[in-house]
From Swiss-Prot:
GO terms for biological process: catabolic process; regulation of appetite; taurine metabolic process. It comes from the Eukaryota. Keywords: Cytoplasm, Hydrolase, Metal-binding. One of its GO terms (molecular function) is zinc ion binding. Disulfide bonds: none annotated. A divalent metal cation 2 binds at residues 169, 201, 230. This is N-acetyltaurine hydrolase. It catalyses: N-acetyltaurine + H2O = taurine + acetate; N-propanoyltaurine + H2O = propanoate + taurine; N-acetyl-L-methionine + H2O = L-methionine + acetate; N-acetyl-L-isoleucine + H2O = L-isoleucine + acetate. Its EC number is 3.1.-.-. The keyword Electron transport does not apply. The gene is pter. Belongs to the metallo-dependent hydrolases superfamily. Phosphotriesterase family. GO terms for cellular component: cytosol. Binds 2 divalent metal cations per subunit.
Length: 349
């Protein structure tokens, strides 16, 4: 049994689970996303290097990965700190920060934000998708990768003594690469040693979450303490969603606020609206899965910040919760999704 058993580990140290309050389970507060830059069409090429202005804001919102400045969330620390305070004023208590190795995790900055705002911040250990893996990461064995993950939780990350409180988001592509498979196997082994929560970023294919769960199970993971992220852009068929729900992971709808005509990473996909997301939550609740749902915004680009006319970290509390209540989701279920389920997930076994 880990010394962290029964506790939640924040960047400021362990806390009692009851101290979490309303929790966003998948956000980014300081990161860069240059790994996923998408060059714009030739006739719009100058927009890639343009500053974000009112006159190009619609274009940036529809093509968020084609504007280089938009991918540098770590430039907006002051604005993000202010927005965390707005989240707190709206009734928020904790944020799980899922930035891992490969997309510029800054755990020192997360500690500073937690100290300045009084909001609990839980940092993620691990590695993002294969495209961000270094040659040294790719050359590691499962045992070596496991040691890295365990050390980031027990000793500290990035050369500091600031410790991660989850493993994840662990990045997976579609199809899964060999390096990503090793990281998944290491994640399962580290989780079995630590009893810690895990968060997975699946590839953009409806079969990806199933494949990932199979690999984790075979490697000894605790699926009941594992979150499958981004289901709102991954599984659209209701029957398939309910089939996946039976596997026992937490079901994360974490793109609230993302309503766009153009989903750059998969042009064949219609990104659901927030109203569509609420419908899927209601379906899962009606089928008995209210204990397995968690929600968030996954803010990872500047355009989604309040500073740039976006929804910010308070969107779920200010705008989505009232709509959930109007649309047939009880206050008891809302509290489970925002309070109880994150608490159960984040508490070390």
């Amino acid at each position: 049994m880990s010394s962290l058993s029964g506790k939640v580990q924040t960047v400021l140290g362990p806390i009692h689970p009851e101290q979490l309050g309303r929790t966003l389970t998948h956000e980014h507060l300081s990161m860069t996303f240059e790994c996923c830059y998408c060059p714009p069409p030739a006739h719009q090429g100058t927009l890639s290097d343009a500053p974000i202005l009112m006159k190009n804001l619609f274009w940036v919102k529809q093509n968020p990965y084609s504007n280089k400045e938009n991918l540098l969330l770590s430039q907006e620390i002051e604005a993000i700190t202010e927005e965390i305070m707005i989240f707190k004023a709206a009734g928020g208590g904790s944020i799980v920060e899922n930035t891992t190795t490969g997309i510029s995790r800054d755990i020192k900055m997360l500690k500073k934000m937690a100290e300045e705002t009084g909001v609990n911040i839980i940092s993620g250990a691990g590695f993002y998708v294969d495209a961000t893996h270094s040659s040294s990461t790719r050359s590691m064995t499962v045992e070596q990768l496991t040691e890295v993950l365990v050390n980031e939780v027990l000793q500290g990350a990035d050369g500091t003594n600031i410790k991660c409180g989850i493993i994840g988001e662990i990045g997976c592509s579609w199809p899964l690469t060999e390096s990503e498979k090793k990281v998944l196997q290491a994640t399962a082994e580290a989780q079995s040693q630590l009893g810690c929560p895990v968060n997975i970023h699946p590839g953009r294919n409806s079969d990806a979450p199933f494949h990932i769960i199979q690999i984790l199970q075979e490697a000894g993971a605790d699926i009941s303490k594992t979150v499958m992220s981004h289901l709102d852009r991954t599984i659209f068929d209701e029957t398939k969603l309910l089939e996946f729900a039976k596997l026992g992971s937490y079901l994360e709808y974490d793109l609230f606020g993302t309503e766009m005509l153009n989903y750059q990473f998969n042009q064949a996909v219609d990104m659901p609206s927030d109203n569509d997301r609420i419908k899927m939550l209601r379906l899962l609740i009606n089928e008995g899965y209210e204990d397995r749902i968690v929600v968030s915004h996954d803010i990872h680009t500047k355009n989604r910040l309040l500073k740039y006319g976006g929804h910010g970290y308070s969107h779920i509390l200010n705008n989505i919760v009232p709509k959930m209540l109007v649309r047939g989701i009880s206050q008891q279920c809302v509290d489970k999704i925002l309070l109880e389920n994150p608490k159960q997930w984040l508490t070390f076994k």
